[in-house]
Curated annotation (Swiss-Prot):
It catalyses: [protein]-peptidylproline (omega=180) = [protein]-peptidylproline (omega=0). SUPFAM superfamilies: FKBP-like (SSF54534). Its main location: nucleus. Transmembrane segments: none annotated. Inhibited preferentially by rapamycin over FK506. This is Peptidyl-prolyl cis-trans isomerase FKBP3. GO terms for molecular function: peptidyl-prolyl cis-trans isomerase activity. Residues 128-224 form the PPIase FKBP-type domain. Belongs to the FKBP-type PPIase family. The modification N-acetylalanine is found at residue 2. PROSITE patterns: FKBP_PPIASE. The keyword Signal does not apply.
Amino acid sequence: MAAAVPQRAWTVEQLRSEQLPKKDIIKFLQDHGSDSFLAEHKLLGNIKNVAKTANKDHLVNAYNHLFESKRFKGTETISKVSEQVKNVKLSDDKPKDSKSEETLDEGPPKYTKSILKKGDKTNFPKKGDVVHCWYTGTLPDGTVFDTNIQTSSKKKKNAKPLSFKVGVGKVIRGWDEALLTMSKGEKARLEIEPEWAYGKKGQPDAKIPPNTKLIFEVELVDID
């Protein structure tokens, strides 16, 4: 369901005046802009922190661009959002090879993400950060093939989350891509297509058949 289109809150003169605090503009943009729009303009996160790094001209341009592009909250699907956020995060990479794997147009992401518990929406992992996760992996028929969540209280005490460097190929691609869109504390359900999971070969040791979609519940508990 599409969100109601917001109205312009200020004129150009009001936007540029000293009387209007930057925080008010940032709050308006965060309230009404889509996640990918905010990511592109580096407006995600705590308002105070954004206000420190964003100058007034940048905010005025973002405000005008929001209404020109009509990329309001609720206008994009989750897969579109994650693709946009992924592209923004990749923009920090070296641009020397325009035909590298990252810049090829591969179409929409090969996974869907449903948020089960919201994170802090401030701390997002970057490529190369170490992330710590609890997870359960299931096949489409509900069979659990892997988990690090212990049910017995004795084992729970000694249980540790899975820790790895994100975005560098240590895990299946669906995980690498999805975790870059999650904030600390977030729990999400990921449905990952075979192309971004174990593909045509499957994973016989884990009893994952070839060409199998995998479902994970992943909780991002910490980022280093």
